[in-house]
Amino acid sequence: MTIKGVLFDFSGTLFRIESSESWLRAVLDEAGMTLPEPELLRTAAALEDAGALAGGSYPQHVPEHLTGAWATRDSTAELHRAAYTGLSRQVPLPDPALHDALYDRHMTPAAWAPYPDAAEVLEGLRSRGIAVGVVSNIGWDLRPIFREHGLDPYVGAYVLSYEHGIQKPDPRLFATACDALGVIPQETLMVGDDRRADGGAAALGCAVHFVEHLPAADRPDGLRPVLDMVG
């Protein structure tokens, strides 16, 4: 099989979100608030356990009143915000407005960093004439993240779940991405970190390759095998 197009997931594949501690510190600083260090660390850990940071850990428990929003969170911007701010509100903060501020922070370029080998791999694909798309379950526009970090020139199409009302693993989302790139599924490789969501591309006929969802420092070259796979 000749690969003519590669689709990448966003979070945990090309980019990694900041830590919960960094996330909380940034929002408190922006609000001009402080917490004693032990309390800040406890609060950050509680937010992590709650799954309040999109792109971070999954929630240890989803409250019953949020189960519907959580299951369909990536289908609309409104549900995405409702799900994650709802999880955040399980953790007491000094000001209730901080819950929305935390959500807003996670949509900023400063909250994200590309994996160390992301640019190298994307450049390698471009030099081989291979089309690149991003397919993400998400509730907001991630294009500014790619522009700010210099990766946008490598991407031929962005297919975001909330813009189509379809979530991975629905094959229609991957089909939309293939159509946007002008490639057929049988000549397309999907790269992601979620075996259920990203694995949905296999039903369409795409090859699938998984990477580990790890902190960037712990995964310096996890994307490089993609270049070997496309030849």
Model-found features: residue ranges?
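Asp-based, Mg2+/Mn2+-dependent phosphohydrolase catalytic module
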Residues: M1-F8, P38, P94-L98, A119, ...
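N-terminal helical cap/lid subdomain that shapes the substrate entry/recognition surface
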Residues: I3-P116, R143
